[in-house]
Amino acid sequence: MPSFKNIFKVVGQDGPAHAAQSGDVMERIRHDVQGNKVLLYMKGTPEFPQCGFSAAVVEVLNGLGVPYESRNVLEDPELRQAIKEFSNWPTIPQVYINGKLIGGADIVTEMNQRGELAALVK
């Protein structure tokens, strides 16, 4: 009869393939963040946000008239987890401007109200 230690070892033995796949997602995130002036990781799409926080960020960005790219984390569970690890930020949405994490809905809304966000996206 296998011990728990052995069972866990067997269950986790798919690690290298998963690690390679995770590395691919991290590379895709890195490429997207560096390659887009304004990038939004969100639940849903700008046309159909799937949470109130994502909708709030879309409203702010659209209100500024700034072009931005978005990624729907609901379409890709691996992306949804990887973006949180990439940024060390636990929630979605996440807004990146000029390759740097700005924050989520509360921070973006507050920066917009103070006029700071418009200066960053120009």
Task: Describe every region a protein language model picked out.
Residues 1-36, 43, 47-64, 74, ...:
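Non-globular targeting/processing and membrane-anchoring segments
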Residues 91-107:
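A short, hydrophobic beta-strand/beta-hairpin element that forms part of a small beta-sheet core
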